[in-house]
């Protein structure tokens, strides 16, 4: 009996296995390779562009360096020629400004691009091109001024012991000048302001300038020495500017002492001036008065003035608040003459026969400078005679030479 075949009427739920499509995989791989290739080409183009930019920057840098060298050479060439000294007045913009020349004229000028604009302040000293008046350099504050500080090596070696007599004058000037600078707290505790200025006055040769030299030697403060006639300059405005420079320099180096010798050259009593020179001197005096009693007064700057003609000075200068202390240097009396003779002959090789008291007791009115000249002339007379010892006749010769003058001498002073 043949076997019968039974067919399952329900189909199987498991799907037949399928094979991967080789065409689909190749297409995706090709797309990925195309993307990578495109990115590679893009990066290559970017690298090439960056290389081109780098070469351009290098070339531009070389050009700028050459331009910089040419500009530096041009600046050196401009600054190498003689320049005109001027004064900066006002900044208009970053490239232009107004300057004043020494002739009194003001100019609207171009400012060199290499100049530091922060240095361009009013009243600053500048250098101008001689032809175009362009501002090419800024000078140091004291470059065009004859005023300068005395360094430690330049300070005189005069001490208080080298000045015979003048004990009262020494004490007064030390109280008015040295003590406020070294012990200012003493004045604060007492509740007073120290003197601002000191006037030394008296006949010629009585030790005014020498005492100021001793002050300069004994103090550590900056010392500025100027003669009154130095403020009188050729062009208008130069004198008052020098006065401002002196006080500015003193304030920058405070504590400082300003010594103005022969102050009567600029501080005579004011009058109705008829000439430009007289008006300029009066402007110098007014600037001096303002600097000594201005709004920006500082206690660390002391002023010493010396003159032979205190009677001609302007009353505004002599008032308290400017010159608080006035120290007189009279002709030496008998005791003062003895001290001056002792100081002058301390290092001299005198004979035992020399009696200095004889010259001290003589009634002639002589100054300390004349006593120094007597001792010097006595030494010169001994040298002329080839002697190493000074005899009484040498002193007598020196005394007659400097004191016993004929009445006909120096008639032009009368």
From Swiss-Prot:
The keyword Acetylation does not apply. GO terms for molecular function: ATP binding; ATP hydrolysis activity. ATP binds at residues 202-209. Residues 21-30 have a biased composition (Low complexity). It comes from the Eukaryota. Induction: Down-regulated in response to mixed metal ion contamination (cadmium, copper, lead and zinc), but not in response to zinc ion contamination. It is found in: Cytoplasm; Nucleus. One of its GO terms (cellular component) is proteasome complex. Its main location: cytoplasm. Residues 55-81 form a coiled coil. The keyword Coiled coil applies. Keywords: ATP-binding, Coiled coil, Cytoplasm, Nucleotide-binding, Nucleus, Proteasome. Residues 1-33 are annotated as: Disordered. The 26S proteasome is involved in the ATP-dependent degradation of ubiquitinated proteins. The regulatory (or ATPase) complex confers ATP dependency and substrate specificity to the 26S complex. Belongs to the AAA ATPase family. This is 26S proteasome regulatory subunit 6B homolog. It comes from Helianthus annuus (Common sunflower).
């Amino acid at each position: 009996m043949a076997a019968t075949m039974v067919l399952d009427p329900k189909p199987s739920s498991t799907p037949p296995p399928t094979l991967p499509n080789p065409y689909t995989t190749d297409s995706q791989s090709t797309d990925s390779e195309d993307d990578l290739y495109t990115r590679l080409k893009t990066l290559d183009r970017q690298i090439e562009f960056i290389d081109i930019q780098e070469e351009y920057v290098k070339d531009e840098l070389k050009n700028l360096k050459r331009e910089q060298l040419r500009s530096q050479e041009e600046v050196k060439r401009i600054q190498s020629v003689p320049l005109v000294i001027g004064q900066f007045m006002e900044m208009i913009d970053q490239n232009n400004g107004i300057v004043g020349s020494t002739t009194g004229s003001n100019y609207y000028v171009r400012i060199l691009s290499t100049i530091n604009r922060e240095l361009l302040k009013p009243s600053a000293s500048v250098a101008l091109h001689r032809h175009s008046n362009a501002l090419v350099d800024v000078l140091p504050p004291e470059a065009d001024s004859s005023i300068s500080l005395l360094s430690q090596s330049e300070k005189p070696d005069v001490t208080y012991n080298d000045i015979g007599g003048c004990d009262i004058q020494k004490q007064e000037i030390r109280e008015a000048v040295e003590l406020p600078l070294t012990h200012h707290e003493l004045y604060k505790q007492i509740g007073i302001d120290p003197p601002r200025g000191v006037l030394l006055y008296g006949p010629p040769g009585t030790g005014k300038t020498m005492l100021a030299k001793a002050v300069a030697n004994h103090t550590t403060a900056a010392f500025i020495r100027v003669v009154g006639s130095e403020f009188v300059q050729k062009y208008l405005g130069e004198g008052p500017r020098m006065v401002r420079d002196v006080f500015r320099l003193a304030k920058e180096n405070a504590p400082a002492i300003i010594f103005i010798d022969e102050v009567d050259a600029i501080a005579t009593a004011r009058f109705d001036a008829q000439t430009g020179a007289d008006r300029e001197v009066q402007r110098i005096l007014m600037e001096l008065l303002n600097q000594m009693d201005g709004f920006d007064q500082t206690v660390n700057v002391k002023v010493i003035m010396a003159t032979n003609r205190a009677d001609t000075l302007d009353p505004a200068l002599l008032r308290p608040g400017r010159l608080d202390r006035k120290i007189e240097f009279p002709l030496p009396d008998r005791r003062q003459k003895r001290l001056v003779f002792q100081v002058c002959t301390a290092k001299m090789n005198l004979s035992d026969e020399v009696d200095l008291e004889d010259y001290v007791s003589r009634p002639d009115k002589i100054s300390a400078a004349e006593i120094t000249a007597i001792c010097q002339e006595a030494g010169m007379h001994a040298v002329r005679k080839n002697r190493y010892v000074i005899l009484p006749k040498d002193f007598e010769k020196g005394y007659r030479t400097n004191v016993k003058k004929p009445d006909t001498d120096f008639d032009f002073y009368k």
